[in-house]
A protein has these predicted regions:
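A conserved segment at the C-terminal end of the G1
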Residues: 2-16
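Acidic, Mg2+-coordinating active-site environments of NTP-dependent enzymes
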Residues: 58, 78-85, 100-188, 201-223, ...
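Active-site catalytic microenvironments for nucleophilic, acid-base chemistry
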Residues: 9-13, 73, 207-214
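Short glycine/threonine-rich catalytic loop with a Thr-x-Gly-x-Asp
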Residues: 17, 192-205, 230-234
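A short glycine/serine-rich beta->alpha loop
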Residues: 55-60, 189-195
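Aromatic/hydrophobic pocket-lining residues that form π-stacking "cages" and hydrophobic walls in ligand
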Residues: 6, 70, 148-152
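ATP-dependent carboxylate-amine ligase catalytic core
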Residues: 12-98, 114-116, 122
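Single conserved hydrophobic/aromatic residue that forms the stacking wall/gate
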Residues: 235-245
């Protein structure tokens, strides 16, 4: 939902946006969207052939191969922003090869323990590796783990913590976002339902606040984007790169 909201707001702002997510629900093409539309078969086949020819004897996993192909395709799309969803964890994920301009960790939960570790501290360490030195690193988890905070500080990332740097408040009709220097009030609740949607939405608005000099968005675009009910997804861009785990 974080990427879905971010994509919708940026599209409502008139930006040309690409989105890479996984897994797909029905068709593989769902993994790559440009301006809100899934790419065509021909678009994918051309990029698959490009990666197959370039890899030589290098062995690639399914996810590595498809990630490289889709990123290669996005390079030709004259994008303003590209949203990339991390597949698993962060530190060793293929998506992490992108040097993101902004990164979002929405939560640190016990998941995929056989690969990421069986504690929140271990998983937080893996996820924190999508952060970059000197760039916004958004953490929307209300109880951030020490390993994530320590790594962000050790590399000199611009760490934004929920409850310290940004927050939200709300009543039955509307909610409000408060950041370091931006406040957004009278917001309708996100079309995407769920217990964590305001946490996710506040993380999105924190990322947009952090990137506002490169990707300015209006209050109208935010309201319009939050009202759109899109498939759950995630984020990163190379003209305004944002990563999400």
């Amino acid at each position: 939902s974080t990427c879905a909201m971010l994509e919708a707001i940026l599209l409502a702002s008139g930006y040309r946006v690409a989105l890479y997510t996984s897994p797909h629900l029905v068709r593989f093409n769902e993994r790559a969207r440009v301006n809100g539309q899934a790419v065509q078969d021909e678009w994918l086949l051309e990029r698959f052939e490009q990666v197959e020819q370039a890899r030589g004897d290098t062995s690639l996993t399914y996810f590595e191969f498809t990630t490289l192909a889709i990123l290669a395709g996005f390079q030709h799309e004259s994008l303003d922003a590209c949203i990339l969803e991390v597949g698993l964890g962060g530190r060793l994920d293929a998506v992490n090869l992108i040097d993101a301009d902004c990164s979002i960790v929405t939560s640190v939960d016990i998941d995929h323990a056989e690969y990421l570790g069986d504690t929140r501290e271990a998983i937080g360490f893996e996820k924190a590796h999508i952060f970059r030195a000197g760039r916004p690193a958004i953490c929307a988890d209300p109880v951030p783990v020490k390993s994530l905070v320590d790594h962000a500080q050790s590399i000199g990332a611009d760490l934004w913590l929920f409850g310290r740097d940004f927050n939200y408040s709300g009543d039955r009709q509307q909610w409000a976002y408060g950041g370091r220097s931006v406040r957004r009030g009278s917001l309708a609740y996100p079309a995407l339902r769920g217990a964590n949607q305001l946490l996710n939405a506040s993380g999105v608005l924190a990322a947009l606040e952090a990137m506002r000099m490169r990707l300015p968005v209006s209050a109208q675009a935010i309201r319009q984007g939050l009202a759109i009910d899109r498939k759950s997804t995630r984020l990163n861009s190379s003209h305004a790169n944002i990563s999400y785990a």
